[in-house]
Structures are given as C-alpha cells and as structure tokens.
Curated annotation (Swiss-Prot):
It is found in: Secreted. This is Subtilisin-like protease CPC735_012930. GO terms for molecular function: serine-type endopeptidase activity. Secreted subtilisin-like serine protease with keratinolytic activity that contributes to pathogenicity. It comes from Coccidioides posadasii (strain C735) (Valley fever fungus). The active site is at residues 160, 191, 323. The keyword Signal applies. Residues 21-118 form a propeptide. The keyword Hydrolase applies. Transmembrane segments: none annotated. InterPro entries: PCSK9_ProteinaseK-like, Peptidase_S8/S53_dom, Peptidase_S8/S53_dom_sf, Peptidase_S8_Asp-AS, Peptidase_S8_His-AS, Peptidase_S8_subtilisin-like, Peptidase_S8_subtilisin-rel, S8pro/Inhibitor_I9. Residues 36-114 form the Inhibitor I9 domain. It comes from the Eukaryota.
Length: 377
C-alpha cells in the first residue's frame, strides 16, 4: 500500500517547500525497482506544461550527472497522458529526485516497482468447465451457450506477456500492438496467450469473434514495472481513440501487485476515457483492496471460483464485483457490448446485474455473485 514517504535511506534530504509534491513509498519494499520513479503532475497541468517541466528535469538531471561523474541514472523512460492525467517515469539520482519532488507542478512521486501476472494453472487440452458454468444458471452443464454476435465489433487489449498472434485458435483476429518491456515481440511465457484465448479463441473463448491486441507489459518471467503497465494503458487509450472505438474497447489486466497510487489513478482515467477494464483480484487469498489495480472502484475486478461454486482457495476476496477470472469477465463484457449495444462504461454494472447469487463461502465482505453471460438458460 502506498503511504507518505518518511525516510529515504540516509542520503536524501526531504525539504519542505510550499506547494511541493509528495514522495510516496510502499510498506512492502520487496518489488521496488531501486532508483526508478513515477512522477505524477498536479491536476490541470497542460501537455505544454508537462513538456516544459520535463525539459527542466532533464537539465537538472544532466547537471547533476556532470557533477557526480558516470552514473547508472539514465533519465526518462515513459511519459503518460491518459485523459489529462499526466506524468512520466525514469531513473534519477537522489539530487534530481529531490528537485523533482519539490517542484511546484508535481503532485507526487512514487517508486516504480514490479507487478506480476496472476498465476494460471493450465491443464493442456482440458475441457473448459468455466464456459459451461457462465452460460447456465445452475452448475453441471458442459455445453457453452452464447449470443451469435460473439463479441463482434469489440476490440480487446490484453496487457500481459504478449500474444501468439499467429495461433490458429485466433483465426487472424489477433494483432500485435506495442511492447513496452523488452525487445522480443512475441509471448515467451504463455500467460498472455492463455488469457487472450479465454477471452476470444475459437474453442475456449467467451467471445469468439472479438478482435485481440497484444500489449506486452510483462516479460518472459511474467513480471513488469508499473511504469510500463501505465505506458501500456496510455497507448491503448490513444489507440482506441485513433480507431474511433472508445466505448467499444475492453482491456484485460490479469496482473497484480500491492496497492500503488499511480497505477490505480491511471486505471481510473482509462475507464473515464471509455475503456472497460477487467482486472484480476489476485491469487494471494487476501482482500483485493490491498492490490493494484484490483482496488480501483471503477474497474470490474474478478475473483476465481471452483467447479463446485465455492471461492477458489487461492483467490483474493473483498467487496469487489463478480467471481470468475478476469478474462471471462472481459469476454462477457464483449458479448454484452456487441449484442446489447451498451457502452464500455455501462458494461460492469450490467455484468453485476446479470450475475447470479451462486457462490458458496465467498469470503469476508465478498459478493456471492457468479458471472453469467445472459444465455437464457
């Protein structure tokens, strides 16, 4: 969880300045990337203000490096502008960081850290009981029933380890979008391809006509920095806007980490801009309010259930939306957006309204509702 930063080693002096930003930190420092930071500007900062600020920060950084000699501090990595939520990330020395924190245009600075894909237990060539379950009001059915529109006209951004876009299960409906984590434009892990398959493959997909876009933000170890995930969301919002499909686009985030202010705010803005966000609650068997971006109120957070309609033993819990995994939720969102013509911003409420009270022993303050695709059975 992000808290106000009080002590930053012994080398950084935090100076009190009127209207200065705040330096945040995580209670659990396990996944922090040392020396890397996300800088978020104050509300109302224009794009030209951001550009001027970054020019100023670059000059400060270069000046400090010149005084200190060779350094690993490399400066800027990404810049963000999601519906007016603006900022940037980079690696900075302590003197530069101190100057940035105390700049009047800065809202806060948060250490960058590594987020991880939620673990998937994959049984190869196994029948998907989940498809049968979400299309029936009672368990025990194996057939999958769904509206014939099958998500046609909806675009799904899969922010993950990439997608094997040439896999025959995707029937040419998958395309490569952007890679913000490494130089390898393919899925070296398999997590992203599995997630994409659950959303929209011809055999195991919930929405079998949805188009899929690979947005690679996690590497072959299924981990990636928050800054890259934010950059991926920023790219997806702009891409959807350029294609004129805001309101008809969804984003799956089957990844998690401790609560992070910047990542949560970026997710909020992506929803405000017109994307449906389906997010994994996490696999740590704890309240999802402690996870990002699962703790964001406006995203559709999904926990996992078992075949007997009980909460899966590994799934997180809390007062956060329907059960079943995030890719299933994204698939149902695509179905409803295609068949009913609803907008992305309406899809989560529609999903919650359709969901059935079927989950047994869901956990503290947790919904007992199970995902349902409105098949009529």
């Amino acid at each position: 969880m992000s808290i106000l930063f009080k002590i930053f080693a012994s080398t950084l002096a935090v100076v009190s300045v009127v209207n200065a930003g705040e330096l945040l930190n995580f209670e659990n420092e396990r996944d922090i990337i040392r020396g890397s930071y996300i800088v978020v500007m104050k509300d109302g900062t224009s794009s030209s203000d951001l550009k001027s600020h970054m020019n100023w920060a670059a000059n400060v950084h270069h000046g400090n490096l010149a005084k200190q000699g060779p350094s690993r501090s490399i400066g800027f990595q990404f810049s963000f502008d999601i519906g007016g939520w603006r900022g940037y990330s980079g690696k900075f020395d302590n003197d530069t960081l101190n100057a940035i924190v105390n700049n009047a245009h800065v809202k806060y600075v948060e250490p960058d850290r590594m987020a991880s894909a939620t673990v998937l237990k994959i049984q190869k060539n196994a029948p998907s009981w989940g498809l049968g379950r979400i299309s029936h009001t009672f368990r025990g059915f194996k057939n999958y029933l769904y509206h014939s529109s099958a998500g046609e006209g909806v675009l799904a951004y899969v922010v993950d380890t990439g997608i094997d876009i040439n896999h025959p299960e995707f029937e040419g409906r998958a395309e490569w979008g952007i890679n913000v984590v490494d130089e390898v434009d393919t899925d070296e892990h398999g997590h992203g391809t599995h997630v994409a398959g659950t959303i929209g493959s011809k055999t195991f997909g919930v929405a079998k006509k949805v188009k899929l876009v690979a947005v690679k933000a996690l590497g072959k170890d299924s981990r990636g920095p928050d800054s890259g995930i934010i950059a991926a969301m920023d790219w997806a919002v702009k891409h959807a806007k350029e294609r004129g499909i805001l309101g008809k686009a969804i984003m799956n985030l089957s990844l998690t980490g401790d609560t992070a202010t910047a990542l949560n705010e970026a997710a909020e803005r992506a929803v405000e801009e017109g994307l449906f966000l389906g997010v994994a609650a996490g696999n740590n068997n704890r309240d999802a309010i402690n996870e990002s971006p699962a703790s964001v109120e406006t995203v559709c957070t999904a926990g996992a259930s078992a075949e007997n309609d009980e909460k899966a033993s590994f799934s997180n819990f809390g007062s956060l939306r329907t059960s079943m995994a995030a890719p299933h939720v994204c698939g149902v969102a695509a179905l409803l957006m295609s068949s009913e013509g609803i907008k992305a911003q309406e899809a989560c409420d529609r999903i919650k309204k359709l969901a059935r009270p079927a989950i047994r022993n869901p956990g503290n303050s947790t919904t007992n509702k199970l995902l349902y695709n409105k098949s009529g059975f």
